[in-house]
């Protein structure tokens, strides 16, 4: 009898324990939100509006903002009986110059339309096969938080090119004409550099933030907002990228798992997304290194010398490396600001010279000349250097003082023509004269002067995702038996959790002194990731990171560990 009672008691205990387990691991947990795959969504959109192209020039199909992220762009679709060119003209507003573009001959015309005005009935003229058709495309006003031009001085300067800008922190990637009108913008969190590739597409940072200051990688798109390639990079991307002559991309990155940051660049194969070369300044340059000791913020490649030139904001130096071997060719730096180990690489000054001090935005002008932004007595200056390779000397040719001490980014258009971005201000200078100055009501990162149209032939090819974030680095695990249930934790720390194609994105706001980890558990496996390491400072900070898809598979329950206490978030994620 006692054995029977014992069995029943054991059964009750097991059932009770199983019930608790089922509740804790199944009933009490909800899935986190999953974001729709961008490339899948754009393919579905294309299938819908390209399924029928049987329209005429007299009654074309007009699709405003076809990909949902470029509100001042459109597609016009129609067919002609014969192979013929087509020309579109976007009529200028209030007497401004018209924008005209002629497309290559075809019978099925799928025409990208760029340069529409916001909140306006845009008049667009289409001409093909001797027929002229005027249509109206009505656009929505700019968002309330848009970076608008607040002050413009252009000395009646007219140009058919546009000023493409990226935001420093918050804002929109956009293009302004010389009248200060917004003629194109993207919806999405695109930061760092913007540039036009040789194929006419633009290259931007991914709008996915890997962690503070680093995006997941790069996106190649057209001005319609169609993504052709999305590149994931294990160390993420920051500041600058350069298109090499072979088409590959050389970009500033990072190396996770060590204490130093922003001292690595990588070359990624354009066709595969694989890293084919790593430039690790930590191992290349001499001297002591800790934290953000170098601070890569610009990279240039010189085909004539097969070398790369890199600026180090915190290192106060310009470094040139032989690209095949990564041997140090030369360094421009004040010998009193660098370790003695650099002495054999330093170029000697030919005359008086202002050495790089928090240098930014190196641009190679021609041959042995370069221009960069540097700080002198608290002010930003544009310096022009000339290098004598034979004698290993550097000469300062010019010094142009800038109007403010804000971060400065520079684009060389020609030897005597360049665009400067400083804080809220865009300035173009030709022959040492300011020809346009434009202020906006938000802080900008960089500006490139480019045309809207460049080799624009619309194709319905499917976008491709390449590369990988690699496996996320884990730390030591902790017992979860003491985990607390506290639903207020999500709100208290503003915890955000969602899943996308790259992995689990986690963000939250903590005290800088907080020690924070994310714990993933699926009973059979447990993984712990650092979200924030404690800092010896006051205040709060918002942090975010990705836990990569690579190296993890299955259903995991999510816990948050803060200063030694573990909390159940009652959420799970499927990898």
Regions found by a protein language model. Name each.
Residues 89-97:
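Extracellular low-complexity, O-glycosylation-prone stalks/linkers
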